[in-house]
Structure formats: C-alpha cells, structure tokens
Amino acid sequence: MKTQVLAVFVLCVLFCLAESRTTLNKRIDIAKRIECKCKGDAPDLSHMTGTVYFSCKGGDGSWSKCNTYTAVADCCHQA
C-alpha cells in the first residue's frame, strides 16, 4: 500500500514538472512574438528582439532601439 501511494505521488510530481516545463516553453515562444510599437513609427510595428538580436545588437549592426519593453527586452527596428 505504501509503495502504491509513493508511486502515485511520484507520478503526480513528474506530471506537474512536465506540464510546467511545457507551459514555460509556450510562454517563451509567445514572448518572442509580442509586437511592440516604436515611437514615431506608428502605425508600423516591430517585433521584440529574440536571442539572436538581444538588446538590439544585430550581427551586422542594423538594429536600433526604439522603446524599452521590459527590463530585459527592448523594442527594436531595423535601421
């Protein structure tokens, strides 16, 4: 009986961990697609930077910051 209860508990914990991991991945994917409006560029919208162009630093330097979205994400547009 104790073994069965322990097995059910372990399965519940594993399920909760798997579900929270899936939810976190979905939030990260959604965050990368949030559009932000640049001041002076209305009605144009530019996407937040992802991991490649973090803080508006493109590989070729063609991105510039136009607005701060959060403490760790900037709204950028191609210059």
Swiss-Prot record:
Disulfide bonds join C36-C75, C38-C66, C56-C76. One of its GO terms (molecular function) is sodium channel regulator activity. Residues 1-20 form the signal peptide. Its main location: secreted. Residues 21-31 form a propeptide. The keyword Plastid does not apply. It holds the Pfam family Toxin_4. InterPro entries: Myo_ane_neurotoxin_sf. It is found in: Secreted; Nematocyst. GO terms for cellular component: extracellular region; nematocyst. Keywords: Cleavage on pair of basic residues, Disulfide bond, Ion channel impairing toxin, Nematocyst, Neurotoxin, Secreted, Signal, Toxin, Voltage-gated sodium channel impairing toxin. The keyword Disulfide bond applies. Belongs to the sea anemone sodium channel inhibitory toxin family. In neuromuscular preparation of crustaceans, the toxin increased neurotransmitter release, causing repetitive firing of the axons. May affect sodium channels (Nav). This is Delta-hormotoxin-Cpt1a.
